[in-house]
Regions:
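Acidic/polar, low-complexity extended loops/arms that serve as protein-protein interfaces
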Residues: 1-145, 172, 185, 237
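Extended oligomerization regions of viral-like shell subunits
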Residues: 107-235, 240-246, 250
Length: 250
């Protein structure tokens, strides 16, 4: 029953943004990050300096996303094919929505991945074009390159689309699904008026196993129901913190 064939990844806006998606993980995972070697100019016979960079680790560990659903046996036998397809879509959508809302959220939840906007203080003044350029500059100064994108909430998108670049051009901060020449992806999973800008390839989403579905025909048997227990295991962290600039708009 309920062999879910629809890939979860296809439902994630973060996958469209370029996040690195790791599946089939076993045990806790450590992803090494290297700060990069350093070289210096020296005299002809002067001693060379130690140019070794530093290794750090980003650790991923499984966090359980779970629920149970009680289904009427009558509902299942009346139209089993349609019921199964509906449940497949609903379960995948629910997991995708919760996973992204957690990753793109502003909270630290026990036994869950930390939200990327956690600790970000909301702006006290309206965003300006200078602020947007400053975000770009911050990434460039950190040597962040790649497929740079914005991921924003609907309310942040509305704000950007109505923020004028200047007094005379008639142009706005967001036009044609771009801000400052960079693509914008919008999802209600982003907390508040959140804006996350960066190289999302440096965001790692890990999944342990598949979406585990256990059919329990006994617990609710007296009530004519079947209990479906859902378990899935995920974690998500930036591989490089400096790959992202985050704001919560006023």
């Amino acid at each position: 029953m309920l062999n879910i064939l629809e890939p979860l990844r296809a439902k994630l806006v973060l996958a469209q943004a370029g996040a690195s998606y790791m599946t089939g993980l076993v045990g806790n995972i450590s992803i090494p990050a290297y700060s990069g070697s350093q070289v210096t100019w020296e005299g002809e016979v002067a001693d060379a300096k130690d140019g070794a960079g530093t290794f750090t680790e980003v650790k991923l560990e499984p966090h359980r996303l779970t629920a149970y659903i009680d289904l009427s046996k009558q509902f299942l036998i009346q139209d089993s094919v349609s019921a199964e397809e509906m449940l497949k879509r609903d379960i995948v959508n629910a997991i995708a929505n919760k996973l992204e809302a957690t990753i793109l959220g502003s909270e630290t939840i026990v036994n869950a991945p930390e939200g990327m906007l956690n600790g970000v203080v909301a702006d006290s003044e309206a965003i300006t074009y200078e602020d947007i350029v400053a975000m770009e500059t911050e990434l460039e100064e950190a040597n962040v390159r790649g497929d740079i994108k914005f991921v924003v909430s609907p309310s942040a998108k509305a704000k950007l689309k109505t923020t004028k670049l200047d007094a005379g051009s008639g142009k706005f901060a967001m036009e044609g699904n771009e801000v400052n020449g960079y693509p914008v992806l919008c999802t209600s999973a982003v907390a508040g008026k959140g804006v996350i800008y960066g190289n999302f390839n440096d965001l790692v989403i890990g999944q342990w196993g598949g979406i585990d579905l256990t059919v329990d025909p006994y617990t609710q048997a007296a009530n004519g129901k079947v209990r479906l227990v859902i378990n899935a295991y995920f974690d998500a962290k930036p591989r490089r913190a400096e790959s992202f600039v985050k704001k919560i708009l006023a």
